[in-house]
Amino acid sequence: MRPGYIWAVITKEAQDLLANRLLLAAVVFPALVFAAIPTAIVAFIEVNELDPDQIGQIEQYIRQFPDLSVKLAAQAFIVLNFMAYFLLIPAMVPMAIATQSVIGEKTARSLEPQLATPMEVSELLIGKAVASAVPAVLATWGVFVLYGLVNGAITQPEMTRLIFNDVWRVAMLTLVPLICLLSVLLGIIVSSRVNDARTAQQIGGFIVLPVIGVAVAGFFSGQATFSLEQVLIGDLVVAALIGVSLVIGNWIFDREAILTRLG
């Protein structure tokens, strides 16, 4: 593994991304949408009085926050429950960058010079994966910080402290980057076998299904957030899947076959 080759790939991919403003906007916009929905609900609750019937419907959920007022507890449940969807951002957004990275280069015939170099396939994969994952990670972190500050400003400072809890700080620093890398690797692997970006994104999009399942299950179970143990287990599982994806990608990303098709 030669860091110089990996850095060269990262630099090239970063330049291509910065030159594509539409793709760059696609990194930030979904994250803002996911954050805006619960924030709008919180703002609505803040300016309206809760109906007693509504309180009865959500009583089982707000019991998790016995030290908060009823209104703030309802807002806290909404805000914390929707945070599971922050894991969708690193699962979905990098896929668009990764598929464009391979399929766009195959179409523009700029992938061929990279494959013709003495660079190892693993070095190319890691370089493209890191370059595609970093923007999504930074976007997720940025929107997460904004999410905490804005909701705290709408309600009370206590809300910001609830959002920036230990579990979600660990999840942001470990699980989000790992999910990004896994999503990117799967996108690159799929893109190496097909020639249409939409097809690659649809196939690779299956990675978001388990995340959606976790988010929905958490909502209906009444649990507003994950435990630290669940996050750490998720880290181990995703890290193992990344290792498997690298092995499979090194095997599937057939340099000679791609060069033959491009030729």
Stretch-by-stretch model annotation:
Residues M1-A31, L262:
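Aromatic- and glycine-rich beta-strand/loop motifs that create alpha-glucan
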Residues I89, M119-G148:
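Selective transmembrane-helix segments that form parts of the transport pathway or gating/packing helices
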Residues A19-P52, N81-M95, I207-G218, A240-S245:
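Hydrophobic alpha-helical transmembrane segments of multi-pass membrane transport/permease proteins
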Residues R193-Q201, V216-L236:
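Extracellular/periplasmic helix-loop-helix junctions in multi-pass membrane proteins
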Residues N48-Q60, L68, A73, V145-L173, ...:
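Membrane-interfacial helix-loop-helix connectors in multipass membrane proteins
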Residues L18-A25, T160-V208:
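A structural motif at transmembrane helix-loop-helix junctions in multipass membrane proteins
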Residues S101, R193, L241-G263:
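Junction motif at the cytosolic side of a transmembrane helix
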Residues L17, P94-P113:
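Transmembrane helix boundary and interhelical loop/hinge segments in multi-pass membrane proteins
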